[in-house]
Amino acid sequence: MSPTAGENILLKAEALSVYYGNSLAVKDVYLEVPKNKIVAFIGPSGCGKSTILRCFNRMNDLINGCRVQGRITFHDQEINDGRVDAVELRSRIGMVFQKPNPFPKSIYENIAYGARINGYQGDMDELVEKSLRQAALWDEVKDKLKDSGLALSGGQQQRLCIARTVAVQPEVILMDEPCSALDPISTLAIEELMQTLKEQYTIIIVTHNMQQASRTSDYTAFFNARATEGGGKMGYLVEFDTTEKIFDSPDQEATADYVSGRFG
């Protein structure tokens, strides 16, 4: 039985493979992402976690020589169909990157800019406040909205990037190691925020932090890599299941070894 049986599936990958030029980077991934859940991608460096993550909003389209095979469906629609507009897709499936990357604009404009480009016609002040509240940042910045977003601390900048993402009203938030550059207190703030956000959004997070995956996610996908001829690596999905099962009683020995710290 599928680990997501009975869930409302929002995103699905089937026979998903990614090539860089002629090199196969990730092979034959199958997984389902349920709505309003947090899915963690874990695994050693070079196993394709971030590559697969970027497939879900077609960020790999921007990488020269990158080619995707297989199917990804969002609301049962194939996202690589020529009729799907990639820019519109990215407004529905937003992304938060590893390093906080606020625009060199005011805190207010960091939120308003993307919403304006996406045609938002409502009360902008209201949207800015709502987005900052959703990112648990409003109380810290409400009196300095005209200040540069770059003047904030690293943890605040990352929450500003999350606020910027939710301002365009996506359904899914992709997070590529969002806490790797943050201190433990800022990391905890992001993790607590994720639990609140999943009430309205579906979240996929790539993380190297086993404790973070076990604390925050509902489902976990463990990726590994094997060496290829020519000295490269090919990533593949070892196991996908509920986070409880992955960490407590995984089916694959490699998964047990990784989550227990015996390799990685």
Curated annotation (Swiss-Prot):
Predominant place of localization: membrane
GO MF term list: ATP binding; ATP hydrolysis activity; ATPase-coupled phosphate ion transmembrane transporter activity
Residues annotated as binding ATP: 43-50
Class of enzymatic activity (EC top level): translocase
All residue ranges annotated as the ABC transporter domain in the record: 11-250
Keyword Membrane appears in the UniProt entry: yes
Pfam families listed in its UniProt record: ABC_tran
Organism superkingdom: Bacteria
GO-annotated biological processes: phosphate ion transmembrane transport
Entry's Gene Ontology cellular component terms: plasma membrane
Keywords: ATP-binding, Cell inner membrane, Cell membrane, Membrane, Nucleotide-binding, Phosphate transport, Translocase, Transport
EC number: 7.3.2.1
UniProt keyword Membrane present: yes
CDD domains noted in UniProt: ABC_PstB_phosphate_transporter
Record field: catalytic activity: phosphate(out) + ATP + H2O = ADP + 2 phosphate(in) + H(+)
Localization terms from the record: Cell inner membrane
InterPro entries, per the entry: AAA+_ATPase (IPR003593), ABC_transporter-like_ATP-bd (IPR003439), ABC_transporter-like_CS (IPR017871), P-loop_NTPase (IPR027417), PstB-like (IPR005670)
Topology class, membrane: Peripheral membrane protein
Similarity annotation: Belongs to the ABC transporter superfamily. Phosphate importer (TC 3.A.1.7) family.
Subunit structure: The complex is composed of two ATP-binding proteins (PstB), two transmembrane proteins (PstC and PstA) and a solute-binding protein (PstS).
Function: Part of the ABC transporter complex PstSACB involved in phosphate import. Responsible for energy coupling to the transport system.
Name of the featured protein: Phosphate import ATP-binding protein PstB
Organism in which the protein naturally occurs: Synechococcus elongatus (strain ATCC 33912 / PCC 7942 / FACHB-805)
